From Swiss-Prot:
Catalyzes the ATP-dependent phosphorylation of N-acetyl-L-glutamate. It comes from Wolinella succinogenes (strain ATCC 29543 / DSM 1740 / CCUG 13145 / JCM 31913 / LMG 7466 / NCTC 11488 / FDC 602W) (Vibrio succinogenes). Belongs to the acetylglutamate kinase family. ArgB subfamily. This is Acetylglutamate kinase. Disulfide bonds: none annotated. GO terms for molecular function: acetylglutamate kinase activity; ATP binding. Signal peptide: none annotated. It holds the Pfam family AA_kinase. GO terms for biological process: arginine biosynthetic process via ornithine; L-arginine biosynthetic process. Pathway: Amino-acid biosynthesis; L-arginine biosynthesis; N(2)-acetyl-L-ornithine from L-glutamate: step 2/4. It comes from the Bacteria. Its EC number is 2.7.2.8. Substrate binds at G64, G65, R86, N181. It is found in: Cytoplasm.
Length: 284
């Protein structure tokens, strides 16, 4: 009886959040351990099914950095990063596209379809969904910055009940261009702005944004993010993630969340419990 009462209590705690978010569009950046660990992959698919069944419209943007780095290493191509962004040469661009669009994208799509969601895997090149230009004038090679998102493609899929699964590879400026590798955090942010998503959620391999003592900061305003960057509390690989959060919140997204994808059912814990699990970033 006590166990049943606990289940009822959990459902009642979730109800206000379910009512609040039903009908909303949410962009979910899927990466890290949640994308590699077999158990977490299965649970992520189940979480997306539940969101879908509750009337939430998820849009998934995935990364694939570890698989890309591993395959490049096997081929004798060194991976280089500056400020958390990959430098992409012409040879590695071909590998990036193969891994993101041909391997990971289809695996995620298959998982979701297997669990009863109508998922459609697409690349940013499909129907010119993402158009890009070189990042920092070409300093990062074929790593690009998104300059256009064709939101109507995503709208059309959502209206027909599909869950878009998007590989962050963008179209180049002219026919025959190999395309651009887009940081998945940046791609998720730009897509969230373009489709006017209610939330964007980043699954990572850390609890969220941590303070100087290593404790989780549960909520940050835009100005607090900048303060923590200036002081060096936010540093390294967390910088591109918080920058992506800041950009989408400035662009009209209500809140951005950075959560620990290593925790089972972290998406549900963040969205449907009063305590949450990660860091939310919002306007001042």
């Amino acid at each position: 009886m006590q166990k049943r009462s606990k289940i009822v209590s959990i459902l009642l705690d979730s109800l206000p959040h379910i009512k609040l978010f039903s009908g909303s569009t949410m962009v979910i950046k899927y990466g890290g351990a949640a994308q590699i660990n077999p158990t977490l992959k299965e649970q992520f698919a189940i979480d997306i099914v539940l969101l879908y069944m509750l009337g939430i419209k998820p849009v998934i943007v995935h990364g694939g950095g570890k698989k890309i780095t591993d395959l490049l290493g096997k081929l004798g191509i060194e991976s280089k990063f500056v400020e958390g962004h990959r430098i992409t040469c012409i040879d590695s661009m071909k590998i990036v596209e193969m891994v993101l669009s041909g391997d990971i994208n289809k695996e995620i799509t298959s998982f979701l379809n297997h669990h009863g969601v109508k998922a459609v895997g697409i690349s940013g090149k499909d129907s010119s969904l993402l158009r890009a230009e070189p990042k920092d004038g070409g300093r990062f090679g074929y790593t690009g910055e998104v300059k256009e998102v064709k939101a109507e493609i995503i709208y059309n899929l959502l209206e027909k009940g599909f869950v878009p699964v998007i590989a962050p590879v963008a179209e180049g400026e002219e026919a025959g261009h190999p395309g651009y590798n887009i940081n998945a955090d940046t791609a998720a942010s730009e897509i969230a702005k373009a489709i006017k998503a209610r939330k964007v959620i980043f699954l990572t391999d850390t609890q969220g944004v941590l303070d100087g003592e290593g404790s989780l900061m549960e909520s940050l305003t835009l100005s607090e993010v900048e303060e923590n960057k200036r002081s060096g509390v936010i540093n390294g690989g967390m910088i591109p993630k918080v920058d992506a959060c800041v950009e989408c919140v400035k662009g009209g997204v209500e809140k951005a969340h950075i959560i620990d994808g290593r925790v089972e059912h972290s998406l549900l814990l963040e969205l449907f419990t009063s305590e949450g699990i990660g860091t939310e970033i919002l306007r001042d």
